[in-house]
Swiss-Prot record:
Residues 195-230, 239-274 form the EF-hand domain. GO terms for cellular component: membrane. InterPro entries: Cyt_b245_heavy_chain (IPR000778), EF-hand-dom_pair (IPR011992), EF_Hand_1_Ca_BS (IPR018247), EF_hand_dom (IPR002048), FAD-bd_8 (IPR013112), FAD-bd_FR_type (IPR017927), Fe3_Rdtase_TM_dom (IPR013130), Fe_red_NAD-bd_6 (IPR013121). Residues 1-316, 422-456, 521-528, 710-886 are cytoplasmic. This is Putative respiratory burst oxidase homolog protein H. It is an enzyme of class 1 (oxidoreductase). Residues 355-512 form the Ferric oxidoreductase domain. It is found in: Membrane. The lineage of its organism: Eukaryota, Viridiplantae, Streptophyta, Embryophyta, Tracheophyta. PANTHER family: NADPH OXIDASE, RESPIRATORY BURST OXIDASE HOMOLOG PROTEIN H-RELATED. Its main location: membrane.
Amino acid sequence: MKSNTPTEDSTKWMLESVEIDSMGESSSKEPEINLNKNEGGLKKNASRNLGVGSIIRTLSVSNWRKSGNLGSPSTRKSGNLGPPTNAVPKKTGPQRVERTTSSAARGLQSLRFLDRTVTGRERDAWRSIENRFNQFSVDGKLPKEKFGVCIGMGDTMEFAAEVYEALGRRRQIETENGIDKEQLKLFWEDMIKKDLDCRLQIFFDMCDKNGDGKLTEEEVKEVIVLSASANRLGNLKKNAAAYASLIMEELDPDHKGYIEMWQLEILLTGMVTNADTEKMKKSQTLTRAMIPERYRTPMSKYVSVTAELMHENWKKLWVLALWAIINVYLFMWKYEEFMRNPLYNITGRCVCAAKGAAETLKLNMALILVPVCRKTLTILRSTFLNRVVPFDDNINFHKVIAYMIAFQALLHTALHIFCNYPRLSSCSYDVFLTYAGAALGNTQPSYLGLMLTSVSITGVLMIFFMGFSFTLAMHYFRRNIVKLPKPFNVLAGFNAFWYAHHLLVLAYILLIIHGYYLIIEKPWYQKTTWMYLAVPMLFYASERLFSRLLQEHSHRVNVIKAIVYSGNVLALYVTKPPGFKYKSGMYMFVKCPDLSKFEWHPFSITSAPGDDYLSVHIRALGDWTTELRSRFAKTCEPTQAAAKPKPNSLMRMETRAAGVNPHIEESQVLFPKIFIKGPYGAPAQNYQKFDILLLVGLGIGATPFISILKDMLNHLKPGIPRSGQKYEGSVGGESIGGDSVSGGGGKKFPQRAYFFWVTREQASFDWFKGVMDDIAEYDKTHVIEMHNYLTSMYEAGDARSALIAMVQKLQHAKNGVDIVSESRIRTHFARPNWRKVFSELSSKHEACRIGVFYCGSPTLVRPLKELCQEFSLESSTRFTFHKENF
């Protein structure tokens, strides 16, 4: 900010603080910054078009005082900090920044050289460092390349090496041949000092390698490259020169060719505010104040927690209770029936328990097919039954029944082999003839004879097929966590699970044979196995076979566009079959006959229901997905934009058929054939019944929620036509015609949606960059808040990410573009503080129903569920948790 008066020309301004949203920033928000000049009350609202250089100079030089240890070489020697003395009127000698207590606290939190976990445990950490020193030192000297490993910065060796050099220059220690333990202790003490100036001095010494107190553009670039490498930000590293130029442009308005240390310090101390901590404490206090009296004693809280669990899971409870009651009833009915059977006098209770287990086994072998009739369940989700039946837990119920089947089958088999058969074959002939002769004939069988009957053989084979299929369906096998040696490695992974499950067809055939050819002869109408299985098997077979034949004919789709992203992700845009109606959050199955004629794989639909195309984003994790990505990569060519990349752009390969080639059918010879079937219901499709949405996606787990965001965004865009009319939408950033969903009809939508996307790769943000930019542009009322988190980066305040945070702030303020995601949505470092997120939502949306939808790694399921329960109990807001299951 410049002025025509001499007094104002000589005034330097300092950024006291920049308010940062504790959960994340939406680029559509304009931060409000208070500017105080001298003792005047000048206040201005900083918008995106406010120059960053003018923001830097927001406080007058009257806030400087003596002492310190930063600045020019002369000020360093004298132990003082400040700008050149000629920049401060009416002052003599070097000066230092006047920091308020809150400002110092913010700066202290905003510059750490070690992980936050070390704070408060410095003594324990030093003992570990001593042990590592003894391990890695050579002749009592620790070499530079082992310094990072020794102090706990082993994953950022280059950055640790620069810290090593800076600490050596600071202590005037010759470090070329390594350092001893005493010198290492001095380095360690400097790094953990609570003195803000000491930490800043180390950081500045890293930047200012020649020690002249001035940073040139080349030195700034080197530190940006170093920080980008430490945080695994390849694209930022490529553009380091541009970002160094940006810093020089904003901090060196007079084009001196350098910036001074005090200018960099001003910007660094303004990056983080303590408002987050205050806000969290305030929200927690308010939340605790809202706790009803009945929750405040241990017993009352236990009762309340139990009641809350029952309220949250009442659908599951009544279904499981009904299922358990039926199982117990059938077991006891058959048990009592055989207590009156003559065989009871020979085998005792063994035959009763075996027959009871067999009866419940028939029931469960029939029921286990119901949860996997996906098409039927999808239809039922839209009926009144969805209010009382937990369709979202179909896979979990399927697993529970499977465990029960395994138990009942083993119990039934063990009782026959180890109890019934030995007693029947070893009892006296007279006893056998008296009690078993009428059922088994006059010839007493041997144990081997009983084992070689058709009943025993089919039973053992059935156990083998079921055991094999169940084992490969376990989490460790299905997710390929178990690493088997060759050639047994083919038994782990999704393909093994999928094909092994088809062996259960043989198990069902054997079950029917096993239940019909009994050792104890009965009339056909008393053989009930086929009665249990007939309807479920016919129903399941018709859904799998007949509907598949029809769907493959009508659901052969044409590829509109395929995009191969870095990060092993393939985005497919295909034609939408006539009559293919779905809701946001649903998924569909995809098959590529060129790869496998029998494999179908589920993927969330990422297009909105109103689009006239279908899209899925597929991450290459297994053999099938990897080969599919490879096939499409061969047909993809770099686009013109990718051939000449713009600054901050991510490289991608794509190919298009629609819009470029009007003969789309002819162009399909380039691509592998694609078939789809669906759509199928998923928990996220019920998002509309909640007041507020909290959508949490980890990595590729964001896909179910992209369709929801697109659908909501379509209702926010101005001038959206009614259903049936065309509008120009976007597909992966490219313009393509589509149908919009109707904005009328009284369709209920949530009031707000908070989307938290947590990923560990910078390239992931390119998958949905177009959606993020559309939200920033069209969501003027802030209905959708996006919070992107990159876990590969060190959290805000770490020295390894401090300069990146500064560049990010400058770039976003100047151009409205985030340097990490390269979209208009701001990216946060490390992981979200979920307790803070829930605390703020509960205080912000009192007495609202918040739907928490999660898709990603199982590690986060339990913490999110516990937070939902905790804050539902302790506030008037009710959180309902849903997890995506395929």
